[in-house]
Amino acid sequence: MRKEKDCSRKKGKLIQLAILCAAILFTCTACGDKPTLKERVLSVFEEQKDMIRQKIADSDAEDKVEWDDLEGVIYINPGYINPDVVIQFECVAEGILTASIQAGFYYSPDDEPAIVGWAWNMGELVEEGDGYSCSDGTDNYYYTERICENFYYYQESN
């Protein structure tokens, strides 16, 4: 009888150990493969950059052509093509209210970094790393970095 109890305990511990190992393995694989915000945005841009550039090149300041749906883009501002203004393409929006982050890319007609989205009133951009950033002294933060000619990555958080 005692031998059966010991065997039963060992089986129970082995099952618990197997469940624990499976949970650890699942957690490691679920967290390890997720691309960064920047990688996600750059992937969307790379897949559609030729089409976006062509639409901008084919338009003029009088055009009010609506953008077709772009894969991976959730918001475009302004919603029409105008080669003379900054055009924002938001690809990621996570979180809620004061704990949110947005990221995307934008077209800059003069190939200069710009502030897009809600961060427009946070002040001047200053050099940081490979790009530029600004903050209003709170947890609101904006970062932008050149992708290629006339296109920049941006990330804003609050």
Predicted regions and their residues:
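Sec-dependent bacterial lipoprotein signal peptides
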Residues: 1-29
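N-terminal export/targeting and maturation segments
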Residues: 31-96
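General secretory precursor processing signal
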Residues: 10, 31-34, 137
